Amino acid sequence: MTKRAMLLAILFSTFALTTQAQTITGAGASFPYPIYAKWASMYEKQTGNKVNYQSIGSGGGQQQIIAKTIDFGASDDPMKAELLAQHQLLQFPAIIGGTVPVVNLPEITAGQLKLSGEVLADIFLGKIKKWNDPAIAKLNQGANLPDKAIIVVHRSDGSGTTFGWTNYLSKVSTEWKETVGQGKSVKWPTGQGGKGNEGVAAYVSKIKYSIGYVEYAYAKQNQLAWASLQNKAGQFVQPSAESFMAAAANAQWESAVGMGVILTNEEGDTSWPVTAASFILLHKHAEKPEITKAVFDFFDWAFKQGKVAATELDYVPLPEEVIQKIQAQWKTEVKSSDGKTLWQ
């Protein structure tokens, strides 16, 4: 090969790499942010393609994908069927995890405190005001519970984590269901708000005798003590990938529009009661086909090569049969403006 030919080959390969590299943007739920950030870092190292994901809350993710200011949205609160239809959006699950109650009690270690759903609801209703309340003491006989006021911390932003939390409380407490209800944002009876899982974790970490709720990875990363919860079977369980997997084991993904299955208060002796899937949203009519294809490529890579990273962060990867259903939808439901299929 001549020097000129070698130079042309190098220039061509450099140009090819440059043109192939893609940057995609996503925003939404803070619940999956730790794993999405990890996946994005790994993906860029392996492929050169960038994924910029902003943790702004599920409400923001839904709003921005509707407004078409991002390439994909993320939400832990599955979008309602009428909105999916109105805005021609495809929704699919990407990861499974769990929300945990976290506490700042100097005498209590992770998993030591036991709470039932009813007691948890009464705490967040402001009815149980002190840590040594008889209802808590009954579940924790022999524990050194302080005679201190409980400081409740909740989310201040529109949040899929809040949706899952309030959905669970609505299932275990009639009073909660009738007075507060469920949603990405609710009128809290008591407490102070933190923005994102990050904000709630920071508040609980700093404020003694507080209680809040965060995705499990945030509890571990911030070295917060979590409570064990009594599940639907009456068993006290610890949060873990295994207990999240147990809750998701019998999920009927195709029973809900957009695969929007809710996994709170599921059956099973080992099921964690506040388990959730986190969902991805994108437009079915791809105005920028190459970008939509890049979104598919990223999540295809994550489903195949991101499982170990997900497990290390205590998330649960999707089962293979669910991935096959998702990718079948990519092929049939998402098209370019000229009707071409973007996923083969």
Swiss-Prot record:
Keywords: Periplasm, Phosphate transport, Signal, Transport. The keyword Lyase does not apply. It is found in: Periplasm. Residues 1-18 form the signal peptide. InterPro entries: ABC_phos-bd_PstS (IPR005673), PBP_domain (IPR024370), Phosphate-bind_PstS (IPR050962). One of its GO terms (cellular component) is periplasmic space. The keyword Signal applies. Its main location: periplasm. It comes from the Bacteria. Pfam families: PBP_like_2. Transmembrane segments: none annotated. GO terms for biological process: phosphate ion transmembrane transport. Phosphate binds at A29, S30, F31, S58, D76, S159, G160, T161. One of its GO terms (molecular function) is phosphate ion binding. Part of the ABC transporter complex PstSACB involved in phosphate import. The complex is composed of two ATP-binding proteins (PstB), two transmembrane proteins (PstC and PstA) and a solute-binding protein (PstS). Belongs to the PstS family. This is Phosphate-binding protein PstS. It comes from Pasteurella multocida (strain Pm70). The gene is pstS.
